[in-house]
Amino acid sequence: GYNALGSYSVGAGSIEFDFSSPDGNLEGKLASENSNVSSSLTQNGLLFDAYFANGLFKLSSSVMPIPVDISLKNGNYGFTVPILKQMQSQNFGLRLGFSDLQIAQDLWELLDPNNNLKNGPINAKIAFSGKAKLLENLIELRPDIYEDNNLNPIPFEVDEMFLEKLDLSLMGTSLQGEGSVSLDNEDLTTFAGFPKPVGSFEFVLSGVNGLVDKLISSGFI
C-alpha cells in the first residue's frame, strides 16, 4: 500500500498578464488574499480540496467594449476520485462553491442597460458524490483499456449518485436541491442502453416570477 498527504497555504498573491498583437491587446489580473490546498493519495483514491479568499478577476481588451471586473469573497473546489481497480464500490465526488460574487456595475449595465435586474451578490454551492466500481486502474493509461470498454474514456460503473447540496442565489431568486438515485446496471433496456435509475431529486425554486417579469421588461424574453 501507499499513502501520500500534502497541504500548503499561500498569502496574498496575483498574476498579471499583457499580450499585444496586430489585432489588439489583452491584459488581465488574477488575485486573492490567501489560499489553501490539501490533497491525499491512497489506495482509496485521490482527494483534492482548494480554498481561496477575496478573489479578483479583471480582463480588458481593445476589442471589448467594457472591461470584465469580477470579485468574490471566497471560493472552493475539490474532488474525490478512485484510482485503483476494485470490484466493490468506491467513493467519488465533486465540490464547488463561491460566495458574494460581484460583477462590476459597468459590465452589468452592458447586460442590463435599464437597470431592471438586481446586480447583487451571487452565491453558489454544490456538493455531489457517489459510488462506482472502477473496472481498470486509472494510473494505467493503456489505449486498449478504452477499446475494451467501448471507447468509454473512463472505465467505470456508477452504482449510486447523491446530490448532497445545491444552493444557488442570484438576481432575487434562489434554487435549492438534494436527492439521490441508485443505478441498476443490470437493466439496460428500460432506458435504451442506460442503467435504470431508482430514486428522486427534490428542488425548491423561489423568486422566479419576479425575475421573469424583469426579464420581460428588459427585453430578454
Language model features: what each stretch is:
Residues G1-I221:
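Glycine-rich, small/hydroxylated-residue low-complexity segments
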